[in-house]
Amino acid sequence: MNQKKKIENYQQIAMGTGLRYDEVGGLFHGERDGFDFIVYAPDARYPYMMVLHTAAKSADGSTFDKQAVKGFQKSSKKIASFGQKNLDIRVSLKAQSNAEKCKDTLNEALAATTTFLRTNSYSPCCDLCGQNVETGAFRMGGEYYHLCPDCETKMRSDIAMKTQQKAQKKENIVGGIVGALLGSLLGMLSVLILSQLGYVCLLYTSPSPRD
């Protein structure tokens, strides 16, 4: 499937799910039952095999047990797996053959996921600080985040600082290499000039005096 056709199909999926399609980022994002979702295809070879990503925390700070996860995965034939890491919730969906089936799968999985989270007293939150505030979807450094305005500002600032430090380190390394090369060249030039003037000295050991 060529890129133009893929974009057209993704736009149809967006219309059918109420999500927004970001053509530049190649992902969908939007809200369902108060939860901020990012939806993307992790493998370009399978454009209709999606992953749902959101951030949520339980009322008591606990995580899902294996039995609850197993029950959720069995609740829908469209769900392949469920993953939880800290505040990250990821739901992998089974691959579909076309845009229409992908749209139906997304609607079913989004509804099932929000119901599962709400039933287990989970609420939407910021990926970093964990506060129950409005968040926005972001992709930085190949990772996906749901960030509140304060954490977004902090993350952007940290990235800018690291980028600046990396650039400075590069400049220092280049400067050191150039300095070493110049020093070496100047040393060779000095030896050459001195040798032309007859000032190159040789170190030698004088012979011991004979008795």
Where do the PLM segments sit?
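Short cysteine-rich clusters marking metal-coordination/redox-active sites
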Residues: C126-C129, C148-C151
